[in-house]
Amino acid sequence: MNKQRRKELSKIACDLANATTKEQIEDFINDIENLKFEEEMFYDNAPENLQYSRRYMESEDSINYMDDALDYLNNALECEGDDFKNNINNAIEELRRAAI
């Protein structure tokens, strides 16, 4: 993952901690999906000499972490109260992992 996407994911993770409405969550979902798409484009179009390199494997991990975060956020849309907040917190952790 490049520096710019890492920075954007870190910002989303910080901002997500203050999310209180489902509309805000939907906006974050869209932002994460866009970043995930960009990372998938890098991953899918990596030159052969980069495939299976450390950066390539980290990209795959980041995509998986973003997928997990999106699952938690979609679950949050279905929940309220503590379950809502727990899903948000889990998504934040996954985004932090993706941004490493």
Regions found by a protein language model. Name each.
Residues 1-100:
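Feature detects long, helix-prone N-terminal segments enriched in hydrophobes
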